[in-house]
Amino acid sequence: MLYICFCVLSVGGPTEILTTSFVGGVRGVEETGFTLGSFGEGGRSFVDDLKQVSSASVLSAVAGGIIFNLSNILLSASTSLAGLSIAFPVGCGLALVLGVVNNYLFVGGDQGDPVLIFSGVALVMVALILNGVAAAKKGNGEASKETGNAASTAKKGVVLAIIAGVLMSTFYALVARAMDVTNFENPAEGLATPYTAFFLFAVGIFVSNFLFNTIVMKKPFEGEPVGYDTYFKGKLSTHMVGVLGGCVWGLGTVLSYIASGKIGASISYALGQGAPMIAALWGVFIWKEFKGSKSIVNILLSLMFVLFIVGLGMIAVAKS
């Protein structure tokens, strides 16, 4: 959640923000591996674990990073087109729903009470629908103010958010499959600890970033093409905020993978997907994206917040 706040504060284009934050993320993952992943009495150290990981586990974790990176780039583009309070709840919310199902079905270990998990997911789905209705009513209210191009741009942003959400729903399970989720202290041979799996995941992000960012910079979804010189023209303070956001994201994500060994991948993944609420809060209260909307829009947004929080709460207690 804090990662989103730092990235929003890191003023710049989506590619500049993501590149800087991912540099911070890789750096944070490296430090985590050589500290938390290497100290202690039990289990394999980070370096020893990295040496024995099978090629299948490496490919799975790296593929998760590549997919995550692509989904984030598309989600950032959708945010610039449709607005933060619309794009993030749609993209991340869809990723939450599909991701929970994916992790529950395809990742081993005790996943918790399916009734509570999928009831929580159902509430999140209703919250997403309410968000879409609120966005539509807001759009109808502003129809006289917007041009056809503006409406088309917003729709394009929503489509990108949906694609990003579908892609994002798959990355967690790919990384989890590279780990022995039933025994983090002494993982089976060829499988990784959370620290090693997340390092490989971050490598996939970093390497693919050069390809994906180059394409998006040359063929942007909106605006004029830019070069890498634009990135280096940015202020150091701007880059450092992005790096800090990446470090926060890296620490939060590796803790999520560690937690999956105790509470199950589907629950751990869901609890790490509180991003839509923070994004919606920023969109509503900071950027005033719904300012001047009808009272029904405000009611729908309030219900969305309540249902999303209750849904996450049900998922959180599913293991107990």
What is the meaning of each model-derived region?
Residues I4-T19:
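Short, well-ordered junction/capping motifs at the entry into regular secondary structure
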Residues M1-Y3, E30-S320:
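Polytopic alpha-helical membrane proteins, predominantly small-molecule transporters/carriers
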Residues T15-V29:
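Short, small-residue-biased leader/transition segments that mark boundaries at the very start
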